[in-house]
A protein has these predicted regions:
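Sec-dependent bacterial lipoprotein signal peptides
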Residues: 1-19
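N-terminal processing/targeting junctions
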Residues: 14-18, 24, 200
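Alpha-helical cap/lid subdomain in secreted, periplasmic
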Residues: 59-61, 81-209
Length: 209
């Protein structure tokens, strides 16, 4: 009997390790400062107004102090360059990182993109913030007519650096013509769908009640 229980605990421990499971995080109260580092998808390109961008929608749902750090056209290099000042100015409790799409569109080396995102995670953690990494699909002209998939580097980064990951949210939105303003940007409905995926993940993690 003891051996069977030991074996069961061993299996559960292994599964936790493989899935990066951990004790649920503490819920973040209203007015918590949350920085979202990103590109045009975070800025809200394709939305009918700034109020229908996903950072604005997230603020409405959480009452957090959301800092929209999205700049259209930014690559991971450019976002990384902006990050230290953003961290110093806003001192966020949580940093959400959603970057890489422009790197893929410009065919920049994946190794550089991964290194930049890894450094963005490290800088955020060094500032005392927790991190949520958002997986981004490898956008190509071929993907625009099919269903894009998350680039594998995001799962690798989340595992290596032990941060929480939101998977498939952008891929699902950009893979549905009804949710897109154009092949690489969401429309109002798409940003709403993405926000729903994001808030669900935040609840799973424990940051949002």
């Amino acid at each position: 009997m003891a051996k069977r229980l030991y074996g069961l605990f061993a299996i559960l421990f292994l599964l936790c390790g493989l899935s990066a499971c951990s004790k649920p995080e503490t819920a973040l109260p209203a007015q918590t400062t949350v920085l979202i580092l990103g590109d045009s998808l975070t800025q809200g390109v394709g939305a009918s107004s700034a109020q229908t961008s996903y950072p604005a929608l997230l603020k409405q749902q959480t009452q957090w102090n959301i800092i929209n750090g999205g700049v259209s056209g930014n690559t991971s290099t450019q976002a990384l360059a902006r990050l230290p000042e953003l961290l110093q100015q806003h001192q966020p409790t949580l940093v959400i990182i959603s970057i890489g799409g422009n790197d893929f569109l410009q065919r920049l080396p994946n190794s550089d993109t991964q290194a930049n995102i890894a450094q963005s995670i490290a800088l955020s953690q060094q500032s005392g913030a927790q991190v949520l990494l958002v997986a981004v699909p490898e956008l190509t002209l071929a993907a625009a007519v099919g269903h894009p998939n998350d680039h594998a580097m995001y799962a690798d980064l989340a595992q290596i650096q032990q941060v929480h990951l939101l998977e498939d949210a952008w891929s699902d939105v950009l893979g549905d013509e009804a949710l897109r303003a154009d092949p690489v940007h969401a429309n109002d409905t798409g940003y709403q769908v993405f926000t729903e995926s994001l808030t669900k993940r935040l609840q799973q993690i424990g940051w949002l009640d």
